[in-house]
Amino acid sequence: MAAEKIETVVAGNYLEMEREEENISGNKKSSTKTKLSNFFWHGGSVYDAWFSCASNQVAQVLLTLPYSFSQLGMMSGILFQLFYGLMGSWTAYLISVLYVEYRTRKEREKFDFRNHVIQWFEVLDGLLGKHWRNLGLIFNCTFLLFGSVIQLIACASNIYYINDKLDKRTWTYIFGACCATTVFIPSFHNYRIWSFLGLAMTTYTSWYLTIASLLHGQAEDVKHSGPTTMVLYFTGATNILYTFGGHAVTVEIMHAMWKPQKFKAIYLLATIYVLTLTLPSASAVYWAFGDKLLTHSNALSLLPKTGFRDTAVILMLIHQFITFGFASTPLYFVWEKLIGVHETKSMFKRAMARLPVVVPIWFLAIIFPFFGPINSAVGSLLVSFTVYIIPALAHMLTFAPAPSRENAVERPPRVVGGWMGTYCINIFVVVWVFVVGFGFGGWASMVNFVRQIDTFGLFTKCYQCPPHKP
């Protein structure tokens, strides 16, 4: 029988209730089938967390970043990627600190998390009360809902470049049904092989975009006029804000780890790798096609149809299925807790209970099929609060009392100036994101989004489709 031993692991002041990995310790005679299952299916290491963070962060935005560069210009595009990558890593660190603080306090009260997945709104509830819980729940769930919608839209947008016999709306119906199968993936523990494959797929696509654009050379009469208007400039900036705001699932990824206290620098390391994919590909595509990207939000649409491009499309489709699972799984958990089946051991019962969550995702993807502009709108209105403003404010309020700072499980690193430096950085994040991300970005993104509705209409069958060739 597999070991069910619970160890108390001391990491600073942090008492973590760590459960040994099933069928690895204490069962040396486990079958080959079980070992393979553990290897591919049961992930909880630092490496699993890194793959999950990197894979989740660089999904379909890889295809829309050249579009953002055409709005921003080359220099601003590069600088915003570096700036928001660093800022996103900082707020992911804050979320990890708050998670560890919350979990430590609960475990000192003998709370057992073996059949319960901790989520961000519960961290806010435990540290700051029900009003913060409600705020976190509303913003996080809405962001993850539209994050799932964006992946579904991206699936339809990409497959159209291989098979245009069906319009994008029909492809959305088909991929909505395919993505609904993610209800059978229990938790982030079970994304081990998917995270690895997803990152490998986006790595291929990134370098395909880079190399194919360089080999293609600059298009005839190419122009690089960005930025031309304030609306386009801040729309592009908020798409990059969205790109590096993929840590809305940080708490769930941490909870899937065997030793969550080791998460601290993982998101930063994942971001560094992601930048090696996004900077070359976005720069190369923008260099090759320039202003043409303003009317082609999907970078694949401008590259010639080849076997390499078709491979990139197929790999991105698979990866978007994986990222759909990343975005929707926390929603599944919230729904399970709401209807009282979260701690049910029957995975089939939980899967059936999750299915209603897919319906609104499917419906919204059909209403707003605006691949590219929807990223900026979600970035400015939801990501700005969910993963930047709320974590920074929550961290400041949690440790505002002197006793909380003295007894903190994770103290700020000296390199940022201790508590004083941390508060200064947090205040800067809140002010910058509120003014630039939510304020200017929200205005620009909504103006652009409304233009798409006026031009194409809601429920449009085939957004930005070229004339059909018989």
From Swiss-Prot:
InterPro entries: AA_transpt_TM
Ranges in the topological domain labelled Extracellular: 76-77, 156-170, 214-230, 286-312, 376, 448-470
GO cellular component labels: plasma membrane
PANTHER family per record: OS05G0424000 PROTEIN-RELATED
Membrane topology: Multi-pass membrane protein
Name of this protein: Auxin transporter-like protein 3
GO molecular function: auxin influx transmembrane transporter activity; symporter activity
Keywords: Amino-acid transport, Auxin signaling pathway, Cell membrane, Membrane, Symport, Transmembrane, Transmembrane helix, Transport
Role according to the record: Carrier protein involved in proton-driven auxin influx. Mediates the formation of auxin gradient from developing leaves (site of auxin biosynthesis) to tips by contributing to the loading of auxin in vascular tissues and facilitating acropetal (base to tip) auxin transport within inner tissues of the root apex, and basipetal (tip to base) auxin transport within outer tissues of the root apex.
Positions of transmembrane segments: 58-75, 78-98, 135-155, 171-191, 193-213, 231-251, 265-285, 313-333, 355-375, 377-397, 427-447
Location within or outside the cell: Cell membrane
Cytoplasmic-facing ranges: 1-57, 99-134, 192, 252-264, 334-354, 398-426
Species in which this protein is naturally found: Arabidopsis thaliana (Mouse-ear cress)
